[in-house]
Amino acid sequence: MAQQKQYNERIRNAVLEHLTSNANDTFLWVALVCQDLQATARRNVLKRLNLFPPGLDSLYGQMMQQISKSDDAELCKQVLASIALVYRPVTLEELVALVEQLEDIADDSELREIVGLCGSFLTLREQTIYFVHKSAKDFLLTRAAKEVFPSGIEDVHYIIFTRSLKILSRTMRRDMYGLTALGYPAEDVKQPDPDPLAASRYSCIYWIDHLCDSNLKSSTSYVSSLRDGGVINVFLREKYLYWLEGLSLCKGIPKGIISMAKLWSLVQACSRHTIY
């Protein structure tokens, strides 16, 4: 980095001293500081150095403060909240389906920019979003929970569930891959480009898990979702076979069977609480 940014000896020694003194033998801390300095003009490096506190949690807290002061603070927090709760890393397209405020951002470079604003917590590799380290996710779920989940973790799970059902209702249809023939061998199926399931692949497999983890049995919206004529009832009546087809194309039938069993258990549990 020193060569690339053409640091003089004074700046190079100051950076080395600060990294050595404050890293506490944590390579990730060094990597995050260097990532920030990479985007810092050489003339501002010495001033910037003093803003990096020692220790990972302190550094994450500092980065969280920077996000909170940005113009996109609320959007970044919603992205962080969603990424912290998904059950596997999601692609940019899948993230747009889960976060309503991203719907109007059609430009891929803008989406990358938003993920970049969360760069101390998130990284983007081949269109898929990952945490830089498990400690970043742990920080959001514990120390920063009140800021990232102001209405509670369960509420974000429920939002992801409703967004998932919305994208599935819009994309699930008969013969999505244009296979035409019944009983087409699964091993011969080739993913078309563009993929009709690109935005809904995650939701297809995990929507029921988010419903179960929302655990909002006293919520009016939760209750109405499970009632006869509610959004789940309507979805299963209108899209159930297409959803099974989607699961098959996602190679998610085994997970779908488990999810349906979880949904049935949830309905029974809610019935005992006089929902119906």
Each model region followed by its residue ranges:
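Aromatic-residue hotspot detector
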Residues: 1-2, 27
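Short helix/loop segment immediately N-terminal to the Walker
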Residues: 2-11, 73-76
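Leucine/isoleucine-rich amphipathic helices and adjacent mixed helix/strand linkers
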Residues: 14-17, 21-276
